[in-house]
Amino acid sequence: MNAAGSPSVLLVGPYDPHCGEYTFLAPPLGVWRLAGVLEAAGVRTKVFDPNCCSELPQRALEREILNGTWDVVGISTTGMTLRFDLELAHLARRIAPSALIVAGGMEATFRPDLMFELGPFDLVVLGEGERPLLDLATRLRAGQGVEGISGTARRTADGRVVSLSQRALNRQELRDAIFSIPYEQMPYAAYWERLETAYRVGALPSKAAREAQLAEIRSVRLITLNYCPMGCTFCSATNFLHEAQGSVASIARLDADECLQMIERIVAAQPRIRTVIFQDDIFSYTRDHRILPLCEGIATAKRDGRIPAHLQFISTNRIDAMSVERLTAMRRAGFRVLGFGIENFSQQVLGEFNKAQIYRHIEPMLSAALSLGMTPFLDLILSSPRASLEDVAVTLREAHRWLLRGCEIGMYPYVIPFSGAALAKDPSLAPHVQYVEREIAGTGISWSQPAKILPIDPVVADVVLRIERSFELMLGSLESDVAHLPSRLRSLLWILCSLRIMAEHGHYIASESEVRAQLYARLPALRSEATGLVAALV
């Protein structure tokens, strides 16, 4: 406790030592939102991001903990970063044995039992952290115990895990939490500098290329929605608030005027910004009354000088929620990249993902976005549990076609069994889940973590794994000798690595020489070295 009798809270973001593989290098927005809410309530709070340290993250965290007296250390967890998050949790426990160590985030919400089994946690927060942490701070001020806090799980003396549900934040509560985000305190400059170095911006051959890269790097993220309700079977985030509440949570999001207020706040707080990224899993709905007024409000704010005329925007959208009218309005407002969760170009696989309804919208809406000068960014999963080899071939061919037309693509080879996702819970798929043995550094604790849901067809599974092995070999060599490769280049690598393997099974995807030439042309630096590497590895 500080002199005023208020607890001190240290919030630690998810730790991705391979930053860019599981996360994007940016301030952990959910953690900063929690910090803003706690600070507004008079709770001294600090954010520690292990992905943006000037020294080893473990050493930096040790220094941070030793330099303060922390009553609570909160550890954020995700499925992909869990072993690293747990490493920091155990480190915090060793350095601050009297502090409450609290887990939160996606993985903690779906697997509180695993948190207590593997970690040194006193408490696990389920779902949104604002209300439970405020309640925890109130109890610590009053010298009360932590039992019975809604939205938490704890382990009893006899080893049972007792979970208490909580209602998701309503619209006003969500609005207040978002407006509490302390953008003025967030060290974006440090992140931008690291990204510019990683992407070797100074080595780009033209001013236009450098400016385009800076527009992508100097971005600030804004969340305006509590969750995506679409129920994709591979997704865990769609079930996050339902799990914490114990029932279906209501949707809540900012309205157009509130979005504009936040944009103006962000610009004032971070004047070097080039792009606002709306980090909502789904920015617009089919029946959406916000998108057109928001675009008009942005255009008006630019004309009035309230925000810079050059400010650009990126969002993730339902492709079946797009129309030429909406796309035109977004282009005029300054949207330059539109993310679309296409996931797969096979109608059969889309049905398996609970996305069959988007199939007929893909071709016309991608074409319309490109014709208006915007860049669609497509998220793809190369295979599904019930995919055929033809499904894989269709997605590879279409991915290559849309890359040539101007889209950018991020690609995964198979479904990852995220905790809480419908496919991860499907017992019929259990024989096709591959596990990876994970170890928590510095502890000797290990466990088997689900890592891949492979196609049921053994031929398809073998093909996908062979493509993955080839991709990993080539990616490792390229990134060690050239530069960090963004997803747009990784997608070309996936396609290149698939060509010979798919051809063995009678599926022509594209010309190898053409794909290789396209990769050479896009490599960010040291093209001669990269050319030799690719030729040697393919």
What are the functions of these language-model segments?
Residues 26, 185-375, 397:
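Radical SAM [4Fe-4S] cluster-binding motif and immediate context
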Residues 5-16, 69-70, 88, 252-256, ...:
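A structural motif corresponding to the C-terminal lobe/cap of the Radical SAM core domain
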Residues 70, 75-79, 111, 285-287, ...:
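Conserved N-terminal glycine/acidic-rich loop preference
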Residues 62-69, 212, 217, 230-231, ...:
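Glycine/serine-rich loop-strand microenvironments at binding/catalytic pocket rims
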Residues 2-11, 44, 62-65, 71-72, ...:
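Radical SAM enzyme core and accessory elements
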Residues 75, 103, 126, 278-280, ...:
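Conserved beta-strand positions
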Residues 53, 80-81, 107, 283-286, ...:
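Glycine-/small-residue-rich active-site loops that bind phosphorylated ligands and cofactors
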Residues 2-260, 272:
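Acidic, low-complexity intrinsically disordered segments
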